[in-house]
Each structure stands twice: as C-alpha cells, then as structure tokens.
C-alpha cells in the first residue's frame, strides 16, 4: 500500500463549526483543499457507539447490532446506572458484521485503533479501546483484559495508570499521544482514532459558548 489512511473522528463536530475552524491555523491549512460533505444524513439513533460502528461497517444499527451506547439492563449498584443500562457496548464481539480494520488485516494490511468505540477485547489488530471501570472494578485488570495483548504492557504505566477516571479529559489527551505513537512506531496502513473532547464539552456546557470555542481551539491543536 503506497499510502496510509488515518481516520480521526472529532465527535460532535457540526457543520456550523466549520466557519470557526476555518479561522484557526491548522484547519485553515486543510479545509481549502478538503472535500466537505454538508447536511449529512445520520443513522438512527444518532449516538456515538452506533454511529462509529456504522462508520467502520457501512451498515445501519439494525444490521451491526449496536443499537445504543449502553446495553439495556438494570443494575443499580453501578454508578453509571440509567434506564438505558449499566454496561456499555465496549466489546468488539458485540458487532455482528465484519469491520473495516478486520477486513484490512485479513487482506494483509496492518490496522490499529485508539479509543474507537466497540473495540475492546479485539485481538486481530492493535486496539487501545475506550473503557472505564465502575466502582467495583480494578482498572488495571479491566484494561489488561480489554486491550490487545501487548498493548497493556506498552501503554499502562505511561498513560492509563495516571488516569483520573472521573475526569474524562485525561483520556482525551492521552489518547492523542497514544495515537501519534502508534502512527509513528507501528506504521499501520489504517489507523482509527476517536477524539471525544468536543462531545464531552457539549454535554457539559451546551451547544455553543466560550467553553465550546476553547474546545474547538484544542481540536485545532490536536489536528496540527
């Protein structure tokens, strides 16, 4: 393969963000040469985990099986308990159709993913999945089971062991550093990286405002 493909998802980025980003240094370099698709027709439900699974399968949720971020269930002991369910769709084996990175590996290419939803427990390619412990779980044991063999020993001590699990901003920025290391050292033909920072900011502060603008500036730095 003469070229490598890097897919970076800036979660919650909207069309009306583009004029703001166009005035920032790094987006200003690429947007004039970019193919911009406006008024994208979304899947239903428009939630992070179903959307990102559709992106790497090409099929809607009713086919790939990821119908929500969370698995339906009632477990009141879990601090993330809600009517939607306590547990999230963390694990790759819940996807019911082949994915793009799996197909790349089977075609003799090298794939990798960093914080891409629904990739925990993946063994076919390098995966550093988004997953966090509940109050009863040991983070070290959970991550060892969820990450690709070898990835835990490589990244735990330098990154995950320092996470403050109640502060998702830690995961956002460590994730970028891990993705850069994977890109430079592993040289995958396909790299998937999910950047959740803007989505978390909008959940916390609303759709617009100073905090959202500051987050867009941070995305420009990440892009650079």
Regions found by a protein language model. Name each.
Residues 20, 93-94, 172-173, 216-219:
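A conditional alpha-helix N-cap/helix-loop micro-motif detector
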Residues 1-3, 20, 171-172, 181:
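N-terminal secretory/membrane-targeting segments
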Residues 10-12, 36-38, 48-51, 76-89:
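Glycine-/proline-rich flexible loop or hinge segments
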Residues 24-27, 176, 220:
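Extracytoplasmic/secreted envelope proteins and their assembly/folding machinery
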Residues 59-206:
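His/Asp/Glu-rich, glycine-adjacent segments
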Residues 2-16, 29-31, 55, 104, ...:
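Beta-strand elements within well-structured catalytic alpha/beta cores of enzymes
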Residues 18-64, 112:
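Short, structured active-site-proximal loop/turn typified by the sulfatase FGly-forming signature C/S-X-P-X-R
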Residues 23, 207-213:
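Charged helix-capping and loop-helix junction motifs
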């Amino acid at each position: 393969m003469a070229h490598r493909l890097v897919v970076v998802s800036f979660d919650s980025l909207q069309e009306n963000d583009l004029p703001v980003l166009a005035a920032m240094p790094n987006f200003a370099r690429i947007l004039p040469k970019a193919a911009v698709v406006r008024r994208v027709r979304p899947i239903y439900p428009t939630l992070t985990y179903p959307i990102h699974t559709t992106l790497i399968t090409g099929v809607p949720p009713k086919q790939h099986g990821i119908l929500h971020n969370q698995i339906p269930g009632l477990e009141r002991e879990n601090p993330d308990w809600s009517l939607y369910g306590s547990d999230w769709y963390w694990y790759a084996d819940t996807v019911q159709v082949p994915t793009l990175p799996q197909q790349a590996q089977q075609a003799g290419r090298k794939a990798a993913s960093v914080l891409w939803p629904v990739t925990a427990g993946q063994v076919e390619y390098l995966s550093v999945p988004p997953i966090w412990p509940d109050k009863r779980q040991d983070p070290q044991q959970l991550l060892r089971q969820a990450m690709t063999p070898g990835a835990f020993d490589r990244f735990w001590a330098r990154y995950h062991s320092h996470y403050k699990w109640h502060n998702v901003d830690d995961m956002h920025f460590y994730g970028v550093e891990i993705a850069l290391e994977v890109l430079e050292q592993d040289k995958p033909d396909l790299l998937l990286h999910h950047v959740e920072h803007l989505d978390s900011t909008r959940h916390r502060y609303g759709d617009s405002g100073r905090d959202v603008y500051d987050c867009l500036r941070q995305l420009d730095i990440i892009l650079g």
